[in-house]
Every structure is written in C-alpha cells, then in structure tokens.
Amino acid sequence: MTFKRSRDRFYSTRCCGCCHVRTGTIILGTWYMVVNLLMGILLTVEVTHPNVVPTVNIQYEVIGNYYASERMAENACVLFAISLLMFTISAMMVYGAIAHRVGWLIPFFCYQLFDFVVSCLVAISSLTYLPRIKDYLDQLPDFPYKDDLLSLDSSCLLFIVLVFFALFIILKAYLINCVWNCYKYISNRNLPEIAVYPAFEAPPQYVLPTYEMAVKMPEKEPSPSYIPA
C-alpha cells in the first residue's frame, strides 16, 4: 500500500532561486507591512505635530500623473486609510503563510492583480506621451534628475523609459506568481492523502468467463436421479 496526493503538482516551490515560495511570500508581506507602518507613522506625526514636518511641495504619482500638494495633511485621512488597509492585508498574508491558511492570502493576491492591471493600463497609456516625453518632463519642475534626463538623446530616453516599464511590469508579474505558487503549495499541503493499493491479477480459475465463452461451453451432464433405498 502506498500514499499519493490527490492532486498533481503544477507549480514551483522556489522563489528568486534561493528560497521557498512560502518564505518569499512572508518576506514580501513583511516588507509591505514595514513600508505601510512607516507611512502611517509619518502621517500621524504630520497630523498631530504639523510644525515638526516642514512645509514642502510634495509630488506623488496617481495613475501616471503628478499632483502637487503643499502639505501632506490635506490628504492624510485618505493616505492613512490606504496604509492601514495595506498593512492589514499584508499581515493577513504573513499569518496565512505561517499558519498554512490559504484563505488569508486571497486579499493580498487580489490587490496584486488589481495593481498589475492598473500598472499595465498606465504603461499602455503612457506610450502616447513617449514621443513628447521631454515636453512632459519640462512641465514637472521638481522631477528628480530632470536636467540629466533632458540632456539625453530622445531615442535613448525613449529606450530607457520602455526598459523601465518592462522591468516594472515583469517584477509585478513575478511577485504575483510567487504568491500564487505559495497559495498552491499550501492548498496542496492541506489536501488529504489517499491510500492506493497495488493492482493484482486473480488466478485464471477464479475469473468468470465472458458471455461468448459461456455459450460455447458444453453442457454438463445432469446428475443422477435420487433413488430411495
């Protein structure tokens, strides 16, 4: 008697070529937790002690466009809610990976799919700006390394932007695949094992004949009648 899984494995258990997908998922969730925790602390300090954080012109990206804001406190409620939500679903994924609970990985996986779709739409829509990318950068006064980028050749700058978008999309797809493989690994691990008995052949004398063979078989002689003594 042997045991085998009731479902074959069609996923990889390696992440980044150096660790298990479960470990990689825990590291990814922990990273998101730390980033959003720091963001929540920064927003809390900005709201409770507005004089501590200096007033600066902050630019943040929302669906490919930059919007200027004089103070982060104006959008602190929305940003804090987003940070709290991201921290929660990241903590759920870490707990699910540690405790082997597949259901706890689904919220973060759905967020990854939504983020990937939005990123693809942003990348596709940004292709319309590529021929006029220098004009677009010239309208952003505080864009980092603006002068260095404007000094580059247009074709070279276009190539850099395309490579950046491609690597960005590939990275997001790889992280989605990592979480999905972890989901499949935990699901397969929680499946019950099925006992499989080896097949054996019955001896010929115990095998019933087919209908054709039974018809061709000669009839047996009837048993002698019973004669009382």
Swiss-Prot record:
InterPro entries, sorted: LAPTM4/5, LAPTM_4A/5, LAPTM_transporter
GO CC annotation terms, alphabetical: endomembrane system; lysosomal membrane
Entry keywords, A to Z: Membrane, Transmembrane, Transmembrane helix, Transport
TM segment ranges: 25-45, 78-98, 104-124, 156-176
Membrane topology, from the record: Multi-pass membrane protein
Superkingdom to which the source organism belongs: Eukaryota
Cysteine disulfide partners in this protein: none
Stored Pfam families: Mtp
Entry's localization field: Endomembrane system
Free-text note on domains in this protein's UniProt record: The C-terminal domain is necessary for retention within intracellular membranes.
Entry function: May function in the transport of nucleosides and/or nucleoside derivatives between the cytosol and the lumen of an intracellular membrane-bound compartment.
Family label: Belongs to the LAPTM4/LAPTM5 transporter family.
Protein name: Lysosomal-associated transmembrane protein 4A
Name of the gene this protein is made from: LAPTM4A
